[in-house]
Amino acid sequence: MNNISNTIKKPTYSTLSNKYGFEISISNYGASLTSLKIPLPSGKKIDVVLGFDTISNYKKSFELPSAPYFGAIVGRYAGRIANGNFELDGKQHQLFQNNNKNSLHGGKEGFSQKNWVVIDSKLTENSAVTLEYISPSYEENYPGELKIQVTYSLSESNELIIEYSAISSEDTIINLTHHSYFNLDGHTGTIENQNLMIASNTILETNKENIPTGSFIDLSAHAFNFNIPKKCPNSIDNTFVLTDSNIVSASLFSPKNNLKMEVITNQPGIHIYVGGNCFGKIKGKEGANYHPLSGICFETQNYPDAPNHYNFPSAILKKGERYYHKTIYRFQLG
């Protein structure tokens, strides 16, 4: 990659494309994916992720009672941490409580409201852009200075690849994810007639505040068994347990456009989200009036509240060790 060190703190955009006409745009604000345009056989291009036309609207969206986090990188810890509290190396850490008494998606600002820095870019075949954010020690009360790099790649096989890498100056906890809302009919449509598949036999059991109890729910006779594809649910906010990183973890299919998206990840879970109450407040891209069925999130990640459950995969990143997370969104037409 060419080193194009960028210390500009104001919002900037990077655009990547491939030989088939796929095009993505990434803002350094929240390292957010702001558009993902796919050419259909008809010649029409559709944007399959929700978002806003201006960075000011992205910022305003975080003032809503339930911020949508459109397209953002979420951290230092994605999902909820009960009471905003965890123990590490025998010491209690109290995080900012921004979701009732719990901490959600990193706290008051997290990584989604930071101006990241573009440090590398490749605009030829298999184009890519790498963004970096350095989180100071005890930002949001997380221990350790954490250097995070996120690389967005657009392959010539029509894959959006997101790779996350991080290293900490002290032992810390980490759980990064990507928060795009996908709609394969185009961002102005609805997902209600799209088919969802999730390769999972269990979900995390949660309490009324959506905090994991530490137990699991078998999906054999459950409405959220999506091993065989079926219509997207009207509302869902659940973490599905993944057991095999070598298979397609989830997929979404649009009969209207004959377009399929497959999700492959090395993470132990995928949080599926449809719904929310932030809609009708701010106009979406191209004047779109978004609603709870406008999009669906595929948040590949560790389990929420893992630091407080001995039987969940460890969320601890030891001093000097490397965190690595890779997720592929593969698109197929016809």
Q: What are these model-derived regions, one by one?
A:
Residues 1-334:
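An exposed, glycine/acidic-rich loop-and-rim segment of catalytic or binding clefts
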